[in-house]
Amino acid sequence: MSSPLLTLNNGLKMPQIGFGCWKVDNATCAETIYEAIKVGYRLFDGAMDYGNEKEVGEGVNKAIKDGLVKREELFIVSKLWNNFHHPDSVKLAIKKVLSDLNLEYIDLFYMHFPIAQKFVPIEKKYPPNFYCGDGDKWSFEDVPLLTTWRAMEELVEEGLVKSIGISNFVGALIQDLLRGCKIRPAVLEIEHHPYLVQPRLIEYAKTEGIHVTAYSSFGPQSFVELDHPKVKDCTTLFKHETITSIASAHDVPPAKVLLRWATQRGLAVIPKSNKKERLLGNLKINDFDLTEAELEKIEALDIGLRFNDPWTWGYNIPTFI
């Protein structure tokens, strides 16, 4: 079983269904990645900030060594964290990523957020998360996004990265970046679920030839274990009457409806699971179609509910306002 492929604006192929590495426990990560490759996953969406790239690399390299897959058949993703936006820091970041993954290159490198924090040396704290080197004090770095992007373009030219992309960007920032870039973003990764559809942003990205990957496809479910305050105020999508009724009509689990709603509209998805049967089930989401009426019913659930918002991190960062 394998995922359908999407053709990026640089001609490279990207699996439409991948495995998201966010919150995958370090203790079981390598084994989980290995098992995911065994059942057919080829795209692994990771990040510096996830703190598990060494384990992801262990799983990937074991699968390659055991002959389950060739490196060129995989699509490995990482993301540049906020503390590494200075051009010199971008080079340090990719070296760290490749070292942790034990790979010579990655297939896609996102700018994780359009936020430049103060640089924190790797040996001091890694991943730094929201630490800026001075207790709880938040410090920005005076580095424009285009400056960071040009340093990322150099990674492509040097063969360390095949494609570069953007994550958590709004339309105006994308437009500004396109005015000055040499290499256009190949992919935009955004929070996307029925409570936060962002149709105009998706339409704009598509008109610019930028593929869209959805994260947190299950909405509040992704944030339950983080004790996110907004989770308490909304119905889980797995139990929402609209989703469950559509799932019953197709005799599939609610999760499959949520993922198919995205892929049927051309988006890529990156769900995760530690259970083999769910891993396989998530790969098979394109074996049925939702009706136009069902697609519209799901989209009608949109209430603009964003869970991953830097403004709520305690530092009033104006990413989405």
UniProtKB/Swiss-Prot annotation:
Identify the Gene3D superfamilies for this entry.
Answer: NADP-dependent oxidoreductase domain
Keywords, A to Z? Carbohydrate metabolism, NAD, NADP, Oxidoreductase, Xylose metabolism
Report the domain of life of the source organism. Eukaryota
List, alphabetically, the PROSITE patterns matched. Answer: ALDOKETO_REDUCTASE_1, ALDOKETO_REDUCTASE_2, ALDOKETO_REDUCTASE_3
Spans through the membrane:
none
Name the Enzyme Commission number(s) assigned to this protein. Answer: 1.1.1.307
Active site: which residues?
A: Y50 (proton donor)
Catalytic activity, as annotated = xylitol + NAD(+) = D-xylose + NADH + H(+); xylitol + NADP(+) = D-xylose + NADPH + H(+)
Q: Name one GO molecular function term.
A: D-xylose reductase (NADPH) activity
- Which InterPro entries does this chain map to? AKR (IPR020471), AKR2B1 (IPR044486), Aldo/ket_reductase_CS (IPR018170), NADP_OxRdtase_dom (IPR023210), NADP_OxRdtase_dom_sf (IPR036812)
The residues that hold substrate are H112
Q: Which residues bind NADP(+)?
A: 167-168, 216-225, 272-282
Residues at the site labelled Lowers pKa of active site Tyr? K79
Q: Which Pfam families match?
A: Aldo_ket_red
Query: Which pathway is this protein assigned to?
Result: Carbohydrate metabolism; D-xylose degradation
Indicate the enzyme's highest-level EC class: oxidoreductase
> Which BP terms from GO are recorded?
D-xylose catabolic process
**UniProt keyword annotation of Oxidoreductase present:** yes
Q: What is known of its domains?
A: The Lys-Ser-Asn motif at positions 272 to 274 is important for the cofactor specificity for NADPH over NADH.
- Function of the protein: Reduces D-xylose into xylitol. Preferentially utilizes NADPH as a cosubstrate.
- Family stated for the protein in its record: Belongs to the aldo/keto reductase family.
Q: What is this protein called?
A: NADPH-dependent D-xylose reductase
